[in-house]
Amino acid sequence: MTNIRKTHPLMKILNDTFIDLPTPSNISSWWNFGSLLGLCLIMQILTGLFLAMHYTPDTSTAFSSVAHICRDVNYGWFIRYLHANGASMFFICLYAHIGRGLYYGSYMSQETWNIGVLLLLAVMATAFVGYVLPWGQMSFWGATVITNLLSAIPYIGTTLVEWIWGGFSVDKATLTRFFAFHFILPFIITALAAVHLLFLHETESNNPTGIPSNMDMIPFHPYYTIKDILGALFLILALLTLTLFTPDLLGDPDNYTPANPLSTPAHIKPEWYFLFAYAILRSIPNKLGGVLALLLSILILVFIPMLQTSKQRSMMFRPFSQLLFWTLIADLLTLTWIGGQPVEHPYIIVGQLASILYFFLILVLMPTVSLIENKLLKW
């Protein structure tokens, strides 16, 4: 008798996705982050659902409702900090996943890669609107500053900003719609993730060598299910350590002050995972130029497959490209640090140099060095 998992219409899909899926035998732990992102998404949706049961999206009660969750709801503090630090874990996994894709040439599966970029944008949008919900000082001013960037769009900018605000400033209407967006977006992300997986399984997984592995596949279960469970245990350990010992380590103290439109915080800055893009935005003195650079810093990922000049897919056997890749990582860490610093000397010039280097590495140096490597290998 044929196993039910291979005949039942629903079980068959799950079987082909997580059990009998042919997987390259040599994929490393860098391939764990996809499943960890799925775990993060499920966890964020569940903790978010329980938070939404007690939260009120109204300017007069939002801040106190979050305090009520932390003080009066059973394990409310735990759910709230799991959700806040879960977002940080989500972005750590997301950036590692993208870094893996860049290093090993996974972007050559273009449909999967482009859906991935869409997913990144959706997660960033979700995190941004979610940060506004506690209605602290940084929530309010972060929302004001970032939405105001749209006013740089010629002709329709101001109208667009007021349309998003639902008035002439960030107020009750803004908070209510941001809560609605924050609630719906994770479900859109879930649907996109399913499409991401669908495209991935059309082309098969890449592997560290970048060479097709059709002749050497193993079933996903039990080999990679056990490997993913180990990764999940590490993720949960890190998240629980962060949540139970230093829950406010990655947050901003200003967000413990209720939103006040009459008092501006000394340094307005987003959460740590947006600081690199914020640094690029600030490094250009012109408003429209800054907004375009900010957009391009993320959307440049779409152009990565077109910039592939190497005849090898992976960087595994390309030491010069590896050097540039790690220079790019160092540059992104520098930008993250600069984004959290005040706008003064020497941070301004360091930020500008790091921003120029970011685009120069991706658009010029990496494709050029790939061509040189081809020549060295007489290709």
Curated annotation (Swiss-Prot):
Binds 2 heme b groups non-covalently. It comes from the Eukaryota. Heme b b562 binds at residues 83, 182. GO terms for biological process: mitochondrial electron transport, ubiquinol to cytochrome c. The cytochrome bc1 complex contains 11 subunits: 3 respiratory subunits (MT-CYB, CYC1 and UQCRFS1), 2 core proteins (UQCRC1 and UQCRC2) and 6 low-molecular weight proteins (UQCRH/QCR6, UQCRB/QCR7, UQCRQ/QCR8, UQCR10/QCR9, UQCR11/QCR10 and a cleavage product of UQCRFS1). This cytochrome bc1 complex then forms a dimer. Heme 1 (or BL or b562) is low-potential and absorbs at about 562 nm, and heme 2 (or BH or b566) is high-potential and absorbs at about 566 nm. This is Cytochrome b. It comes from Sagmatias obscurus (Dusky dolphin). The gene is MT-CYB.
